[in-house]
């Protein structure tokens, strides 16, 4: 770990472009969460669920937004985005190495096909395999045990963490980050069934394109298209354990959270957010700025808006239905009483 730096609160206010409320000479040496912070730690508050922790925190300073109620005698740094300002401090106290390894250059145990083209200042760690015709751009990092298949291309300043598999003829843009265990370009799940009920594999001859500034989380899998390309748009961030099927096109700057599955040939617009464990059926389109809540099941294309439930519906409708569902026993009893009353009235006639 890098040696820590020390800051006064006055220095921190200048560093993070925040307004200081409190003692400008207070020293900050580290960072911590609200519950565990000491007087030499900075922390941040950005969720009202932790208001009690904020009140009880011993932190030397807390980054808060402009609407947070302040307690007299405590130190605060006021920010429009406390989490981002706090991250700026973390990055300053603990500057990260460009690549997460002690190895530099090309390790002698790496296996590199003679036709591969390796750019300047590329690091290739132990046991990596670089196949025929691969191109790796300048400044990229290839972790231990990575496999890059024939004629795939890796852009500049990419970080490919250990045990990633990038199969043949797949393409990564610049500054792409693949966390450990990612698989790019596995065969799409395509079969046809013959008259005897046997499942016959359909060759998937397409590829995968991952555009600039994408990050893909650990053990996520992105399948190659049957004919053309599965594509991940610029700036999109994908969590761990996500499955993206063949022929899917993910738009720019999407957020896709863990355990989501997206079936084949579905497309998304820009700035789409898909929360955890959502399931998206195939051959659909999610327009720009769609938000899909966790555990939702999307069975039809969606216009811009927020959706939840199985099948997914506008979130206002879902919330209203949940209120009705909680009252269903009351409704059942009311119906039974009405039926009983109707029978009584009919018997009188």
Curated annotation (Swiss-Prot):
Q: Which GO terms describe its cellular component?
A: membrane
Q: What EC class is this?
A: transferase
Q: Which GO terms describe its molecular function?
A: N-acyltransferase activity
By sequence similarity, the record places it as follows: Belongs to the transferase hexapeptide repeat family. LpxD subfamily.
One Pfam short name: LpxD
Q: Which organism is it from?
A: Protochlamydia amoebophila (strain UWE25)
The active site consists of: 246 (proton acceptor)
Instruction: Recall the taxonomic lineage recorded for the source organism.
Output: Bacteria, Pseudomonadati, Chlamydiota, Chlamydiia, Parachlamydiales
Q: Which gene encodes it?
A: lpxD
The cross-references to CDD domains, in alphabetical order and at most eight, read:
LbH_LpxD
Q: What is this protein called?
A: UDP-3-O-acylglucosamine N-acyltransferase
